[in-house]
Amino acid sequence: MARSRPGRTPKVAGIAAAAAIACALSGVRTLEAQGNGRNAHWYMGNYSNEVLVWDEATEKVVDRIPVKRPISLRLDVSEDRSRLYVMDPFFETIEIIALPSKESIGEFTLSEGSTRTWIRSFQVHPSQEWMAMFVQSRTKLADRYRIDEPTILRFDLATYEVTDTIPWPDEETRRSANFRFSPDGDLLYMFTDDLIALDSETFEEVDRWDITEPLEPGLGEMRLPFGQSPYQEEDGVYTGLFRMTDPLQNRRLMGIATVDLAGQDVEFHPIGPSEGVSFVLSPDGTKGYGLKSEIGHYEMWKFDLLDRRVAGRIAFAGRPRMALMPSADGTKLYIYNAGSTIDIYDEETFEFLRTVTLDADMTSVVVVPDPG
């Protein structure tokens, strides 16, 4: 199935056309076409003043990057993989690490005096000259705390100064917001109730996509996937699981969707009843993997993105907090997070292979594939 915004011609129209696109998933590309090699390095935040660098090929920690503050709670990598952004545990300070030299090139905070400013979310412009930041401040007064309204800022990464305040669309303050830039940096996409495209220079609204509307007549509300993957098939295109309500049967469904931000197009295909499964894309874009986690019961899932189906699922000895990542060469699956171990499984059979034990507990992980 496919759905475009009003005024655009859908790639495929109507529910009855679902079978016609079963083997035409947008964005399925080979590993070589994505520019990724067959190895990757993991940058791991932990409770020390270091970021660990773990190499998939050797399964060893190959470097340690000193950082100024302990407990790197969140790590992000720039689109060109040349910068690592390290967030402190108080959501107040960001340190910038140059890759591959692994040297700190600066840090900044918006907190000052009795005012603490929390950085709730941010996105760096492709030029790496500035970032959009969603922040909120708290000021300690003599008899109380004053909590300011959430604000979106334009922050200059050369001067470390706020250079503009980005107005809220419709002058309506939101309690949460996430961002993406278009590949050319001309548009700033804001994810709120709607998907709003702003001119990245003037911050004027240039387009809007009501992503809460049903994609087809008779279908219920559908939550679209916008999660980023180290093996994202192309800029501005996101593949993942969606969930929707079937109003006729009064049930929740789950399926696979590919979303094109620039074209405002969606290709989707329901695959069965909704279950609480995560999703991550394979390096070649033809498969997806997920985890189902319930108290005392854990499953690994595999999705065939060409035939739009569940290709396999197996119960295994998981952990209450965990994440899954495929290896860059596509032969292994890693179970990690919330601890100091990485469990390695065979991608084809789900067979457990071995456990790698680190000397630190992970707080955040970002995977950076080597260039192809």
Give, region by region, the residue ranges found by the protein language model.
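Short, conserved, GDST-rich strand-edge loop motifs in beta-rich repeat architectures
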Residues: 133-149, 236-251
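Blade-loop segments of beta-propeller domains
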Residues: 65-95, 99-123
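Short glycine/acidic-enriched loop and turn motifs that connect beta-strands
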Residues: 91-93, 137-142, 195-196, 244-249, ...
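Short coil/turn segments that connect the beta-strands within blades of beta-propeller domains
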Residues: 39-40, 80-82, 127-129, 184-186, ...
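Repeated scaffold domains used in trafficking and secretory/extracellular systems
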Residues: 70-77, 115-124, 173-180, 215-232, ...
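Blade-level signature of beta-propeller repeat domains, shared across WD40, Kelch, NHL, RCC1
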Residues: 338-372
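An edge-strand/N-cap motif at the start of beta-rich repeat modules
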Residues: 34-63
